[in-house]
């Protein structure tokens, strides 16, 4: 898992997670010797150049440290789902707008992969297994009876997993 250098949170003014300054990633990391993050294109190329021909990319929101929605190009969440996410930012952030309010236009323009805040990526030199989850939601912050993780698979079957014993009744 890694942050997306072009994640919407960074365009919104969030400080870069490793350097604690806003805009440094989208400006190309001008300071030498600092931690860096990568775009989708950069990650895919980096792994392909190392012989990892098979790749599966997941997009994570709000980010990989606090995942609530994990999705793929095969199953994009609707804007309503994303507009309800709680986003948090580290100190030194200079927020220019409400990130959640932009997702409708981002999804309607099919650029959600470019602006995803984080990535999970599976890479392999051999073909990856088929029928993996294409969409996952986790409600760890909900009240105990509603803490359910939902997985939607490539073949569109749905699996619900209770995260708390009290949530079993809601499956």
Show the residue positions of the predicted features.
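Conserved class I S-adenosyl-L-methionine
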Residues: 1-23
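Core SAM-dependent methyltransferase catalytic element
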Residues: 73-77, 110-132
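Short alpha-helix
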Residues: 32-59
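Short catalytic/ligand-binding loop motif for oxyanion handling, primarily in non-cytosolic enzymes
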Residues: 6-11, 63-69, 129-132
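ATP-binding glycine-rich loop module of kinase domains
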Residues: 135-171
